[in-house]
Amino acid sequence: MLRALLLISACLTASIAHALTSAEARGMAIGDSTSRIEALNKAATDPDEKTAAFIQALADDAVKTAGGTVFIVKDDKATDPVTGAALKLPDDAEDVTNNNLMRGELDNALASLKLFSKDPKARADAIKTLASG
């Protein structure tokens, strides 16, 4: 709950969103849960649209990695999370696995992002998600 409140506070004070970098995408997708959550919380403090889309892709289990490269896979098509460019998915690409702790943090990050939605229902749902976390 404290993390969620800190994330909300950071989002409210952020003035300019910075673009998702390859290093941030790798940090959120590769490594142990603790380091991935740290990278997620850092990226979610002032996200751009690509960062928000990448967080959603992580939550949707639509992210794979191979050789330190991160891919978003949708409809059997791989794209670069930073540029959006189409990429060839290597045969040895592995699914990014989210344990329950990571899933909870992804849900909180997505809810925090939805606090700024123009849709009142989305904002209300976000508040409920954060309050229950």
Residue ranges and their predicted role:
Residues A14-I16:
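N-terminal signal peptide c-region/cleavage motif recognized by signal peptidases
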